[in-house]
Amino acid sequence: MYQILTNLTEQISNASGFAHLAILILAMIIGLFLLTKGGDWLSDHSSHMAEALGVPNVVIGLTIISIATSAPELFTSIAAIRGQAEGLILGNIIGSNIANISLILGLVLLIKPIDTKGAISNNQILILLLLTISFCCVLFFNPTQTLSFGTGIALFGFISFYLCWITTRALKKRNSDVSDQGSDLKDVESSNPLTFSAFVVFLSAVALWIGSDFLVFGAKNLASLAGVPEELIGFTILAIGTSLPELATSISLVRKAKNDMLLGNIVGSNLFNIGLVGGVAGILGPVNSQTPHPWIDYLSLVLITALFCYWLKGRKLDKKEGMFLLAIYLAASSCTWIWNG
């Protein structure tokens, strides 16, 4: 798909510079649409399957929905490596994690306040903070600012262990509560068969694959046309685009008052962006930072994550915190554009 788009654009660009720009923008719009719809389908139907199996809400948010909403970042990173646009990857991972907390949670808090008390365990909070700091430190203290094969293996190994650990805990809880949920599971299965959900999950994966090719193709060539680093495009346009499934999911969850699932989705999504997406990218890479001052992005991510983890310790969040988070996102984006643009 990526090669077909490249050949088509080369033919059009020879005839008209405007047509070249138009097709790049159109490719990004199509890519964002497919990624958003694919992420929505994957999130909705994978969470349905988990609920039908009796998995608790917070665990669904930390695992199933988090993996589903991180799928656009994963597919985009793989497409970026295939399309030799590795500069998009680090910007996308860091930018998406910043957007998940400051932009998405900020917008959600403008809709409805959230009480974080008891929503996320201290273990999950500590894991998120330590993984974020470790990821940024490894990149910062590496002279070449490279996400290497060894780092990729370590990240992938960690996220695999984390997934096994939290799944084991969920299965133990389900077994202890299965007698109370038996009748509910029948109702869920009859209203929306698991086989149909599994089929939609497959279709969503196809949409994510095609959408990621379109988005990476448009972003890479647009960065080249504008003369800005690919990583900067990844930090902003790609990060917001691939975070749209998280935004749609979060708005839906806050309206249903599923705060534990919402916060679990943000925590889990950030964990999987670093562990799964970063791990796979490092294994398939290596991935090099292409910005002159990448430490700005690392520092922004660590500070924003630390603030989020502090707030998860039982604070009630409302519009004031929402406005503050949005201001932080604008400040972080402005700094990276000024220093790295």
Task: List where the protein language model places each region.
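Hydrophobic alpha-helical segments, chiefly the membrane-spanning helices
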Residues: 1-341
